[in-house]
UniProtKB/Swiss-Prot annotation:
Region (Disordered): 53-72
InterPro entries given in the database record: SlyX
Superkingdom in the source lineage: Bacteria
Gene for this chain: slyX
Coiled coil: none
Organism expressing this protein natively: Photorhabdus laumondii subsp. laumondii (strain DSM 15139 / CIP 105565 / TT01) (Photorhabdus luminescens subsp. laumondii)
The name this protein goes by in its record: Protein SlyX
Biased composition (Polar residues): 55-66
Gene3D superfamilies: 1.20.5.300
Signal peptide: none
Length: 72
């Protein structure tokens, strides 16, 4: 191969590498934003779960409220 073909291949590889680096940076930004959103949603879910537990009585009776079985 002559020098010009090597230069063309090198330019092509450099171009592809630059494109891949840009793509990786963009994907990293998306992942970071999604992680922040997941963290926020988890906190909202935790708060909603606490509110739901506080407003609704438990469907399971405590042992003191439970009636004994009929054979007692």
């Amino acid at each position: 191969m002559d020098l010009s073909k090597f230069e063309q291949r090198l330019e092509c590889l450099e171009s592809r590498m630059a494109f891949q680096e840009r793509t990786i940076e963009e994907l990293n930004q998306v992942v970071t934003e999604q992680q922040m959103e997941i963290t926020k949603l988890r906190e909202h879910l935790r708060l909603m779960t606490e509110r739901l537990k506080a407003t609704q009585p438990s469907m399971i009776a405590s042992q003191s409220e439970e009636t004994p079985p009929p054979h007692y």
